């Protein structure tokens, strides 16, 4: 990839890989990052790049500084890591490389109060933060998920997010800005509660 990427993804699990391919197929330049842990997660980004057909518009990294440098300003970075301490760890490691006006998007199932805490912390650095509930699982991430967004800086990434989602029966993108703070993750929490209740009813 010869020019700066329009978005970066951190975390190449099933959701991260599906969304990376989805974004690339919509014509965006993208950088992907996965940590390197000896004997646990080795060469994940490189292996993913070796399999993709989008090497001209996608770059793979296992070092955060080079990953961040590959992104066009203001940088837009989508986190797809496990909810909880892992998100805080990634943000702590990432922020030294960021500048005012950059945007972090948490695409995992974080608790909405954690999202609000992180947003407040990042506001002191003038870094925008979005909590984005992403529904559809690995298949949806690849073919078109539904996305529920809350926080600050949505306009910086709204066109991209709306381009990768599913569409409703009227052709409208299944991507909505819910509101400030942790609103996006709050709605995703309610969504998951309804889904799991329905699954329990079917099981019974």
PLM ranges: what are they?
Residues 12, 33, 79-80, 107-108, ...:
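Glycine- and other small-residue-rich loops at beta-strand/loop junctions that grip anionic moieties
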Residues 42-46, 62-65, 85, 152-155, ...:
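Generic alpha-helical secondary structure signal
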Residues 1-75, 97, 101, 138-141:
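NAD(P)+-binding Rossmann beta1-loop-alpha1 motif at the extreme N-terminus of oxidoreductases
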Residues 7-9, 106-107, 194:
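A generic structural signal for short
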Residues 87-91, 110-204:
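Rossmann-fold dinucleotide-binding core
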Residues 63-129:
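Rossmann-fold NAD(P) dinucleotide-binding segment
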């Amino acid at each position: 990839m010869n020019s700066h990427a329009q978005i970066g993804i951190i975390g190449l699990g099933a959701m991260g890989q599906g969304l990376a391919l989805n974004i690339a197929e919509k014509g965006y330049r993208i950088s992907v990052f996965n940590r390197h842990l000896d004997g646990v997660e080795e060469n994940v980004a490189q292996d993913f790049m070796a399999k993709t057909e989008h090497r001209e518009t996608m770059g793979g990294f296992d070092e955060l500084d080079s990953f961040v440098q590959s992104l066009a300003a203001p940088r837009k970075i989508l986190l797809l890591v496990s909810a909880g301490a892992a998100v805080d760890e990634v943000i702590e490691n990432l922020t030294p490389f960021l500048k005012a006006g950059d945007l972090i998007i948490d695409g995992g199932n974080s608790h909405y109060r954690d999202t609000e805490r992180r947003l407040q912390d990042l506001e002191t650095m003038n870094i925008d933060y979005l909590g984005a509930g992403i529904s559809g699982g690995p298949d949806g991430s690849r073919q078109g998920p539904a996305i529920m967004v809350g926080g600050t800086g949505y306009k910086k990434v709204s066109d991209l997010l709306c381009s990768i989602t599913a569409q409703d029966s009227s052709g409208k993108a299944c991507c909505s800005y819910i509101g400030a703070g942790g609103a996006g993750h709050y709605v995703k929490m309610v969504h998951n509660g309804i889904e799991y209740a329905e699954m329990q009813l079917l099981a019974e």
